[in-house]
Amino acid sequence: MAGLREFFKETVEEKLLQQMPDDVLQQTTPATQLLEKRRELEQVERALATQKEDFHVRMATLDQRKAELERKEYQLQESLLKFDRFLKENDARRERAEQKAASENEVAQAREEQVQNLRAELRSLQERKTRNRDILQRYSIFEAFMQTVLGEYPEYNEVQDVITRYKTLVATQQDLRSRDRNNQTEIERVRREMARYKEAHRVSMLDCSNKLATLRTAKERAHTETLYWENQLSAVQGAASKRTLLLGQIKMYAYPPAHPGTCPTRTWLALTREPRCCHEPPR
């Protein structure tokens, strides 16, 4: 009997008495709620049919047990009569008969208790059946509404088609949410990778800037040194030019041309020729 109660509790009572959470009711549409109620009604009907069949089987078993109990009671009466005769005939038989009667009384008492338990369970099942009938009557309005919905949407021939469509949409929504989570994870990974690349680029640019500053400093130092040596070279060249000019002037004054009209080439040769002694006559 405990197994029957557990089966009923698992298949009917919990499915009928449980209430959907408020947040789920707010998120679902009336049509979805009707589909859910329709599914629960079908499950209740199947469970009630199973319970009804099981109840008939158990009632038949109970009737058999009751008949057996009546037969045993009749046998007990016969045994009591025999017990009286056995008491007069033999004390030993009387003792055995008493033991047998006591044993049968225990069995009868146990069976009577079992009958009482079965009757109590039967009353409980009848009460639950009444409650289930009331629940079915309350849910009948949802069935009527579902039929109205089917009339307004001819693309759905049966309620099961609507339920199948709903399940498909739910599965699609779950798949899209899973893809969105995967995409968010990939985006976060790319962002972290980009941040690492930016940091590496910043460090590289900073290093290049430091190297560029060092090279610019070296360039400025080299440019300063170049200007210094160019100035030195210009000074040396200027001094050399002045000395060459002075030497030319000295030669011109020291060796004037012999007479006007002298060939310039000879005059230049005369100026560039090594000076002779003043006592050496010109050639």
Curated annotation (Swiss-Prot):
Q: Which InterPro entries does the record match to this protein?
A: CFAP_domain-containing, DUF4200
The record's Pfam families line, in alphabetical order, gives: DUF4200 (PF13863)
For this UniProt record, give its keywords in alphabetical order, as a comma-separated list: Coiled coil
Please indicate which superkingdom the organism of origin belongs to: Eukaryota
Which GO cellular component does the record give, naming just one?
Answer: cytoskeleton
Per the record's keyword annotation, is Coiled coil included, yes or no? yes
Q: Which residues form a coiled coil?
A: 31-139, 174-204
Family the entry assigns: Belongs to the CFAP73 family.
UniProt name for this protein: Coiled-coil domain-containing protein 42 homolog
Q: Which organism is it from?
A: Monosiga brevicollis (Choanoflagellate)
